[in-house]
Amino acid sequence: MFLKKRSSSGILGTLSLTGVVISSMVGGGIFSLPQNMAASASAGAIIIAWLLSGIGIFFIANTFKTLSLVRPDLKAGIYTYSREGFGPYVGFTIAWGYWLCQIFGNVGYAVITMDALNYFFPPYFEGGNTLPAILLGSILIWVFNSIVLRGIRQAAFMNVIGVIFTLIPLLIFILITALFFKFSIFKTDFWGTAPQHHLGSIGSQLKSTMLVTLWAFIGIEGAVVMSGRASNPSSVGKATILGFSGCLLIYVLLSLLPFGSLSQYQLAKIADPSTAGVLKFLVGKWGEVLMNTGLLIAVLTSWLSWTILTAEIPYAAAKNGTFPECFAIENAKHSPAFSLFITSGLMQITMLLVYFSSNAWHTMLEITSVMVLPAYLTSSLFLVKLSLSKKYPKQAPIKARVAIFTGILGTLYSLWLIYAGGLQHLFMVAVLLALGIPFYIDSGIRHDQEKTFLNRKEVMKMTTLALIALLAVFLFSANKIHL
C-alpha cells in the first residue's frame, strides 16, 4: 500500500553510505582493468594516468564533501545543488538526465550479469542478450525492486554485505600478484618504447588510458544522492572521501601489479575479465573461477546500489515540485514506491529492446554514461558561485578560499571529462535532455500557479537546449556526425 508521508531521515550512517559509494563505482569493469589499462599503454603511462585522474576526481569528491557540510539543507545534492545554483529548469534537466542515465546503466548491469553467468552456464547467456538472459535479467529487475521496497536501510545493509564479498576476491588478486611480483619484469619497457611493441608517445598512451580511468569513478556521487537519508550531514562527505580513496588504491594496484608478472604485450592479449586470465596464468583454474565469481557478485551489488540511487532522484525532485507529485509517493517502509515501479518498468522495457538490438544498446550505454557529467559540472560551479557570494557561512568548517579553489579545479576537470566524452555523444545527450522539456512544463503548470517557472531566463535555457537538440538531429540525419 502506498502512503504519502514524509520520508524517514537519518537511517544511513557512514558505513552504509561508504558502501553505496564503493558499490556504485566498483562494477563489473574493475575485473577487466589489467587488460583495459595495458591495451595501449605502458606501466609508466598508467601511473601518470591514475595520478592525473586521481587528482581531478579528488576535487570532484571534495566538492561534494564541501557542499554537504556547507549546505546540509540541500538533500539529494547532485540534483538540488543544480537547482539552487542555476534555477528550476537546470535542476530538472540534471535530475532528468541523471535518471535516464541510471535507467540505461542498470539495464547494462543486467546484460553484464547475464554475460558473466555464461562462464558457468555456456552458451545460454552468451552476450547477455539471449532469450534466457532477457528472461532472467527481467526477473532480477523486479527482485531488486522488491528488495528496495522492503526498506532503504535493509537494502543498504545488503549492499554493504555485497561490497565485502566483492572486495574479497579483489584483495586476493592483489595479494597473489604482489607475491609473484618481480621488479625486473615490471621495469622492462617501462615507457612502451621497445621497437617490437612500440606504443607511441606518452601523450597518446595517456589519452587512451585516461578514457578508461574517467569512467572508473562514475558513482562517486552515491552518498550525495542519498544525503536526505543520512544520519549526519558529515557522514556524506566522509563516505565520499573514504569511497574515493579506497577505490583509487584498488584501481592502481589492480592495474600495476600484473606488470610484475606479465609484459604489457601479454596483458593486452588477455580476454576479459582479465583478472581471471591473470590468476589462471599465475595459480591455475581456481584463480579463474574465483575472479569470475567475484565479477558476478560485483555486478549484482552495483545493480542493487544503482536501483536505490535511480529511484531516489525522481523521488527527491518530486518533493519540491520539479517532477510530477506522484513520484514522491512512499510505502509504509518509507521507500520511494511509485518512483521504483516506474523506474523498474522503464528498465523492463529497455531490457526487452536489448533482445532485438544489442549493438544499438551498446551505443546508447556510451551516450548515457556522458549524461552524468553535467551534474558534476553544475555541482562544481555551484560551489564556486556559493563561495564567492555573501551566503557562504562564515562559521563553515571549510574556508571560502579553499572552497573556491576546490570548485574551480572541480569545474576544470568536469569540463575535461565532457570533452573526453566526444562531440557526437554530447549532441545525442542534448537530444535526450530536450525530451524532458514537455515534462518540465507539465509539472510546472501543476505546481506553479504564478508561472514563475516560465520566466525569461528559464525560457532562454529551454530554447537554447531545444535548438542544440534540433541541430544535433539535423547533423545526424545528414550524416555529418556519426555515433
Curated annotation (Swiss-Prot):
InterPro entries named in the record: AA/rel_permease1, Amino_acid_antiprt, APC_superfamily
Keyword entries, A-Z: Amino-acid transport, Antiport, Cell inner membrane, Cell membrane, Membrane, Transmembrane, Transmembrane helix, Transport, Virulence
Keyword Protein biosynthesis: no
Main location: membrane
Superkingdom: Bacteria
GO terms of molecular function: antiporter activity
Pfam families: AA_permease_2 (PF13520)
Membrane topology category: Multi-pass membrane protein
Membrane-crossing residue ranges in chain numbering: 9-31, 46-68, 88-110, 130-152, 159-181, 209-228, 241-263, 295-317, 338-357, 367-389, 415-435, 462-479
Gene3D superfamilies (UniProt xref): Amino acid/polyamine transporter I (1.20.1740.10)
Subcellular location: Cell inner membrane
Any one annotated GO CC term: plasma membrane
BP GO terms, sorted: amino acid transport
Role summary: Catalyzes the exchange of L-arginine for agmatine. The arginine uptake by the bacterium in the macrophage may be a virulence factor against the host innate immune response.
Family according to the record: Belongs to the amino acid-polyamine-organocation (APC) superfamily. Basic amino acid/polyamine antiporter (APA) (TC 2.A.3.2) family.
Protein name: Arginine/agmatine antiporter
Name of the coding gene: aaxC
